[in-house]
């Protein structure tokens, strides 16, 4: 995906990046034969699995409402930039990723806050910047420019200024 190629490009530029992806379906990151799965099945609200290489916190919503984007962002450690996949209804800046082969219509202008379109085909008339799906450097440039121009949702939530290295990378 574009996000899988964008993340190392931003990291190469010296940024610490996190990603947040919305899943439209139920998912599991553990499996029935594992203790963590058994802990959740037994009623644990949260299960934290840790090793010397990584850790993961699994939170069961049970009867809770799905958390908002802002609530989810609060669970991330401070980083320079959070790239969000999905969450179309929220007011954060978005780059529309459009693949002709998927046969779906463009999201703009119906979806708010789209700041550019990255595609592998023709685009209806628009004033939005048009980027090629394979031009990851241009997509990274646009993301960083947008972060500097608009300030990011994470920075607003954390009331932190944009780190100088993002400002410098966006020039």
Which ranges hold each PLM region?
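Phosphate-binding/switch loop-helix module in NTP-utilizing enzymes
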Residues: 60-89
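Conserved C-terminal guanine-recognition region of P-loop GTPase G domains, centered on the G4
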Residues: 89-110
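Short, structured coil segments at secondary-structure junctions
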Residues: 42-43, 110-113, 126
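Short, hydrophobic beta-strand segments that form beta-sheet elements in well-ordered domains
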Residues: 82-84, 94-99, 113-120
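Short glycine-rich anion-binding loops that position phosphate/pyrophosphate groups of nucleotides
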Residues: 25, 53-54, 87-90, 100
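C-terminal accessory "lid"/substrate-recognition subdomains
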Residues: 128-171
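Helix-rich interaction surfaces within compact, conserved domain-sized segments
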Residues: 114-120, 124-133
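N-terminal phosphate/diphosphate-binding loop that engages ATP/GTP or pyrophosphate donors
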Residues: 5-67
């Amino acid at each position: 995906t574009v996000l899988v190629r964008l993340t190392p490009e931003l990291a190469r530029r010296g940024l610490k990046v996190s990603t947040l992806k919305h899943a439209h379906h139920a998912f599991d990151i553990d499996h029935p034969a594992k203790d963590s799965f058994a802990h959740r099945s037994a009623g644990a609200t949260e299960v934290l699995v840790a090793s010397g290489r990584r850790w993961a916190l699994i939170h069961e919503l049970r009867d809770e409402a799905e958390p908002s984007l802002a609530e989810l962002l609060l669970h991330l450690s401070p980083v320079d930039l959070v790239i969000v996949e999905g969450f179309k209804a929220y007011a954060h800046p978005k780059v529309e990723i459009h693949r002709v082969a998927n046969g779906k219509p463009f999201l703009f202008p119906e979806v708010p806050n789209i700041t550019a379109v990255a595609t592998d085909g023709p685009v209806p008339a628009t004033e939005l910047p048009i980027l090629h799906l394979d031009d990851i450097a241009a997509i990274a440039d646009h993301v960083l420019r947008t972060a500097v121009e608009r300030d990011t949702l994470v920075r607003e939530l954390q009331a932190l200024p944009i780190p100088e290295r993002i400002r410098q990378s966006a020039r």
